[in-house]
Regions:
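Positively charged, low-complexity intrinsically disordered leader regions
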Residues: 1-31
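Glycine-rich phosphate/diphosphate-binding loop of Rossmann-like nucleotide-binding domains
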Residues: 40-54, 136-225, 238-246
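Short beta-strand elements in bilobed, periplasmic/extracellular small-molecule ligand-binding domains
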Residues: 57-72, 185-187
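Short, well-structured alpha-helical segments in soluble
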Residues: 77-89
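Anion-binding alpha/beta catalytic cores of soluble intermediary-metabolism enzymes, centered on
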Residues: 96-156
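Short glycine-/small-residue-rich Rossmann-like dinucleotide-binding loops
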Residues: 99, 208-211, 230-231
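Short glycine-rich, flexible loops that bind phosphorylated cofactors or substrates
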Residues: 102-103, 213-215, 234-235
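Rossmann-fold NAD(P)-binding glycine/threonine-rich loop
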Residues: 107-123, 127, 230-282
Length: 285
């Protein structure tokens, strides 16, 4: 018997519909959320991501700016642009598309973004607030993971969650968010002994390691919720997650597919963060 599929596309559409209604209400206060996206260089994947963010802004009625800079743009010039956007009243969220060219220090750029406009949730102050449980703009993909679990009707509190992967972008923040929801969390990584044994103990399994089809049914406890954050391009051009979907869905509980699971949520949560930042800037949140 196959597991229920967590439809990230539909959940994302539902959230966007709510955002759209709120934007309409905000326009009654004579302002609209504004997002600035900065792209340095011509990385093909980054160009696609930026276009998708631009489209989301248009669809939801946001004000948006896209700043496309040459690959040889200096760090100083990029920081000057960030500072300008920090002081621009029509912009409530700033996103600098990663990765940056090697001559630019990513941390210096992230640190330069105003905390209240850091809609990626990467600024050290927002990361610190995440750790101690204070209100902050949350990293988009981890926030999307939590939203998917909740909207699948899963009670997180009291569950044993296993997170495979410890990246600063997904693994670490998603483990903190799961703890905030009162799960007991085990984090696994490349140096973890007996990953399969630990994985089989999970009521909720989140996988973000960047290895196509790494997790098969032998890693999964029957009925466990499985969230696949992986996005890997196979030699045949198809996308695959970190989870062997066809194998795992035979034993798991609710499971996210790739594509169509976590992916659609990332930009939606970025739009949500921008909305929150806009409301806060006007004393409405």
């Amino acid at each position: 018997m196959s597991a229920p599929i967590i439809d990230g596309k539909q959940i994302s559409q539902d959230i966007r519909a709510s955002i759209q209604q709120e934007v309409i209400r905000l326009k009654e206060h004579s302002f609209q959320p504004g997002l600035a996206v900065v792209l340095v260089g011509e990385d093909p994947a980054s160009q696609v991501y930026v276009k998708n963010k631009e489209k989301a802004c248009h669809d939801l009625g946001y004000y948006s700016e896209v700043h496309r800079l040459a690959a040889d743009t200096s760090q100083e010039a990029l920081l000057e642009l960030v500072d300008k956007l920090n002081h621009q009243s029509t912009i409530h969220g700033i996103l600098v598309q990663l990765p940056l060219p090697k001559h630019i220090h990513e941390k210096a750029v992230i640190d330069a973004i105003a905390v209240e406009k850091d809609v990626d949730g990467f600024h050290p102050v927002n990361v610190g607030n995440l750790v101690i449980g204070d209100d902050s703009l949350l990293p988009c993909t981890p926030a999307g993971v939590i939203e998917l679990i909740k909207r699948a009707g899963v009670e997180i509190a009291g569950k044993h969650a296993v997170v495979i992967g410890r990246s600063n972008i997904v693994g670490k923040p998603v483990s903190l968010l799961l703890q905030r929801e009162n799960a007991t969390v085990t984090m696994c990584h490349s140096r973890t002994a007996n990953i399969a044994d630990l994985s089989r103990q999970a009521d909720i399994l989140v996988v973000a390691i960047g290895k196509a089809n790494f997790i098969d049914a032998s890693f999964v406890k029957p009925g466990a919720v499985v969230i696949d954050v992986g996005m890997n391009r196979l030699e045949n051009g198809k996308l695959a997650g970190d989870v062997d979907f066809e194998s795992v869905k035979q034993v798991s509980g609710p499971i996210t597919p790739v594509p169509g699971g976590v992916g659609p949520m990332t930009i939606t949560m970025l739009m949500q963060n921008t909305l929150v930042a806009a409301k806060r800037s006007h004393g409405l949140a």
